[in-house]
Amino acid sequence: MLYILHENDQWLAPFRETFTEMGLPFSEWHMASFLPDLTVEPPLGVFYVRMSASAHTRGHSGVPELTAGVLCWLERHGRCVINGSAALDLELSKVRQYQALMAHDLPVPLTYAARSPEQLLSLARNMSCPFVTKHNRAGMGLGVERFDGFDAFELRLDA
């Protein structure tokens, strides 16, 4: 049996269609509404994870973090998990993604991380223009914005 952990019905549609055409039995665990009993052993099968860090943009705040706990449960019981906890960990952090890429000598754009508007402004003052900002967890390009100068960036933060 294939178990699909996800929180986005739209993304799953082509997989659902293909698995049905193939006659592959599967069960969906929609993690925004389903929670397995973590006090018992998980069912036998293959667990395919389609979780996205951008779940909050669909009203599913906290679902990736809950899914991380479920993945630990599955992995602790030796289940076959495709896109398991290591993949989800990378999905949840641009900083960790970039660090993993750099560990394999893959080029990444010059990247800074900040937690507050004050930190963003401090970093931006020392950056050459133009520069691009991106949210850590946004999805589908949400929050990607180009700034041609510091003043425009400062105005955007004040808005």
Question: Which sequence ranges carry the predicted segments?
Answer:
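Active-site nucleotide/adenylate-binding loops and adjacent lid/helix of ATP-dependent enzymes
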Residues: M1, A86-A159
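Nucleotide-activated donor-dependent transferases that construct or modify glycoconjugates
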Residues: M1-E7
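Conserved N-proximal alpha/beta basic substrate-recognition cap immediately N-terminal to
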Residues: E7-L110
